């Protein structure tokens, strides 16, 4: 029980920092004026009246490229701390990082072979 005593400040900070945005959200909902009408339902384009329909369909290719970007961006986030402490960690961690990169490369080659990355 004495070990948890050191984390009291952390838990208090976590609870307070979680409650403040929730309280602000609910307070703004209660204090904000409620006005319903056709102007509230229209889309806003920098003060200009919208022309045409505001809903556009994006091609699935955009999402595939975004997904591949996110995967390799997260890979960079994981590999950067490893690269900074490579001399301390040793060879076993190098092998683990190599396996991690190889798994991602296999996934990239699979997506490439399936044609998921072709723009046509």
Swiss-Prot record:
Annotated EC: 7.1.1.-
Keywords associated with the record: Chloroplast, Membrane, NAD, NADP, Plastid, Plastoquinone, Quinone, Thylakoid, Translocase, Transmembrane, Transmembrane helix, Transport
Bilayer disposition of the protein: Multi-pass membrane protein
Coiled-coil residue windows: none
Transmembrane annotation, as ranges: 9-29, 64-84, 88-108
An annotated GO cellular component: chloroplast thylakoid membrane
Catalytically driven reaction(s): a plastoquinone + NADH + (n+1) H(+)(in) = a plastoquinol + NAD(+) + n H(+)(out); a plastoquinone + NADPH + (n+1) H(+)(in) = a plastoquinol + NADP(+) + n H(+)(out)
Primary location: plastid
Entry's Gene Ontology molecular function annotations: NADH dehydrogenase (ubiquinone) activity; quinone binding
Location of this chain's protein in the cell: Plastid, Chloroplast thylakoid membrane
GO BP, sorted A to Z: photosynthesis, light reaction
Enzyme class: translocase
Pfam families found in the cross-reference section: Oxidored_q4 (PF00507)
Subunit structure, as described in the record: NDH is composed of at least 16 different subunits, 5 of which are encoded in the nucleus.
Function: NDH shuttles electrons from NAD(P)H:plastoquinone, via FMN and iron-sulfur (Fe-S) centers, to quinones in the photosynthetic chain and possibly in a chloroplast respiratory chain. The immediate electron acceptor for the enzyme in this species is believed to be plastoquinone. Couples the redox reaction to proton translocation, and thus conserves the redox energy in a proton gradient.
The family this protein is said to belong to: Belongs to the complex I subunit 3 family.
Protein name: NAD(P)H-quinone oxidoreductase subunit 3, chloroplastic
The organism of origin for this protein: Lactuca sativa
Gene that this sequence comes from: ndhC
